Every structure is written in structure tokens, then in C-alpha cells.
């Protein structure tokens, strides 16, 4: 099972992908697990972020959707949240900017009433065959977007989070099985898993749980926007299940970690990889 070869400009637009990723728009059914909660999701416009936003809304949460510049994708996701009967706020901007991270949290507090769930999901990657191809600016952008942003978001959010709140970092199978072509990205994803494990210990006394999710190859706009077309065509074929995952297949894990169903789950890294081991 594969996708046609295709290429987009960074950051990628979901509506222009073939096939369009399945984020659970027509399939996810909630059962009230997050009623009364406020969630902040970075990279919430498309892919995994959209699937999580839809699932959270159908479980009863209001959602702030942070995104870089993909206005049409973000508005589509907002529409799905609002059709679930929940409030939604869009925040356009770059999480590589520490002040923007602080503004995201303050906006959630001001417009939605607080922060109960923080999902640090926005990510940047590029594929290279040699270290010499990676510019200093690209290295810095990857670090700032993927791991520094999580630090700034958490630092701003924690004072507003009550006992029972949840922080979730989107790590990757690359945290354990790093792709040599994605060296900067893989390093940041390992850092996210490690940072979440540290935070779980720091915040346990406050009753705040912290976990990370390690997706395998998931069909999102990041793929055609950052990989050469020939790699896109065969993306996901090397998993034991023989295919890339769909964003909707991640959403139930985020719901578990955000809800009382996961009330004793903290410090974990949950692998959703199609069979590729994360030990």
C-alpha cells in the first residue's frame, strides 16, 4: 500500500495531498471523556493535530488550534471542532518564537478560560543524505520548532494547570530508531521523549501528568513537503504492517493520555508505529 509520488512546499497543505489523510472526520465518535476541558494543540491544523482536535472536541473539550501559516487547513479543522458543539480559537504564528508560545497560552486562558491539556505537536523536518547539506539555519529551526517550543509552552502553561491536567509531547519512532536522513529531527524527537519523562517527575506532586506519543510513519502534510517524491511514494512500506498510518489511528491514544482513563499514566512513551519497536 503506497501513495503516488508528490511534492509540496513547506509546510504542506492537507487538502492538496493524494490521498487526503483520514483524520477521523467521518468516523470518530466521542463519549464525553473531556467535557469541560480546554485543550491547546500546536500544529493543530492538519495531520495528527487535526485528528486530535476533532477527537478532543467530540469528547467535549474546547480547543485552541495553533498553526504556522496554513489558513485553509486551520479553518477546516476549526469547522470540525465547532460542528462538534465546542468553542475553537485559531492562533497563527511560529512556535519557534518564544513570545508566540507565551501568547498561545495566554490566549487560551483569556478566551477559553484556562489550559487543562497541552499537546506540543508542531514539528519541522527536512530529509538530507549528508550532514554537509544541513545549514545552520535549518538546524536551529528544527531545534526551536520541535523542542524549544515545548519548553516555552510548558513554562507558560503550567502555572494555569490544575491537578488532573495533562501535557502530551509528540515524539517519534525516530527517538529510538533514528533515520540518518532526518538527523536533526530525530535528535529533537528523542529530546521530547526525555523532556516529558523529566517533567512527569517534576510535576507529579502537582497532579499534572506528562507523556509522549511516538508515532511511526503517519501520512501527514509534513511528508510530501519535506521528503523527495520517490520516498513519498514508498513512505510507510517498511513497517511490519506494510503501510503508513492515518492520523485518526493516533487520536485515541491522545484521548487516553488527556482523559481520566489515563489517570495513572505519566512518564510514558506510547508507540503507535505499525509494528516498528520502540523499547
Each model region followed by its residue ranges:
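A conserved structural motif in NAD(P)-dependent oxidoreductases
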Residues: 239-250
